């Protein structure tokens, strides 16, 4: 039986990916970069350290990166945050995990204030044992740093006793590099095949599907 679940947030617990994608796309366009919204969507889930180099040269990242990131965060908060909702059965899943003594950690490329806000949106305040944010690491997913810090907070629970739940290949790659079983959440941006190829042991259709198959979740580590 697993002893801990590490959760991604955006696109996994809350329906925020499209808002982030539109905010990043607009911020990039304001600074003269036009990768296209579809291309940006497929980079959401990475931190700015990993996202920006997909579209900018190293020199452009140095010159414009901080301003683009700041603008994207501001656009998300002013234009999209109010529309973000939790996916069905998120709180139900967290309550069941808590009842069974399974620890729950949030691992996000976002800032601490953003993760706090996400807990409010997902209605899981008081149901989270620990969180890892961009302030805790120098490299975001798909680097394993975030997962490794989460494991440190879970000690003495081992990597083999945990699973990581996320919606992107970056989540799966980060988890596998840290020795943690990766589980995917199906979504319109990445196919199940892409998630499996990235390292997910299994892909569930949604958090509600994961909750429905809860007994299988417990035996997946």
Task: Specify the residue positions occupied by each region the protein language model found.
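N-terminal helical cap/lid subdomain that shapes the substrate entry/recognition surface
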Residues: 2-91, 96-102, 113
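Short, charged helix-to-loop "capping" segments that act as catalytic/coupling loops
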Residues: 57-66, 104, 148-161
């Amino acid at each position: 039986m697993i002893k801990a679940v590490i959760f991604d947030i955006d696109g996994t617990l809350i329906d925020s990916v499209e808002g982030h994608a539109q905010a990043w796309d607009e911020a990039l366009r304001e600074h003269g970069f036009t990768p296209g919204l579809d291309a940006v969507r497929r980079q959401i889930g990475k931190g700015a350290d990993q996202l920006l180099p997909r579209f900018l040269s190293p020199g452009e990242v140095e010159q414009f990166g901080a301003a683009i990131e700041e603008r994207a965060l501001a656009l998300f908060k002013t234009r999209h945050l109010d529309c973000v909702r939790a996916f069905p059965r998120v709180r139900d899943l967290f309550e069941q995990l808590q009842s069974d003594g399974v620890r729950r950690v949030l691992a996000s490329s976002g800032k601490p204030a953003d993760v706090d806000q996400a807990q409010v949106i997902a209605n899981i305040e008081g149901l989270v044992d620990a969180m890892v944010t961009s302030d805790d690491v120098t490299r975001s997913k798909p680097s394993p740093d975030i997962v490794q810090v989460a494991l440190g907070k879970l000690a003495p629970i081992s990597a083999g006793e945990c699973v990581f739940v996320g919606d992107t290949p970056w989540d799966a790659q980060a988890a596998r590099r840290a020795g943690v079983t990766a589980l995917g959440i199906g979504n319109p941006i990445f196919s199940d095949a892409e998630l499996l190829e990235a390292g997910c042991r299994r892909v569930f259709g949604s958090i509600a599907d994961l909750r429905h198959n809860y007994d299988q979740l417990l035996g997946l580590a």
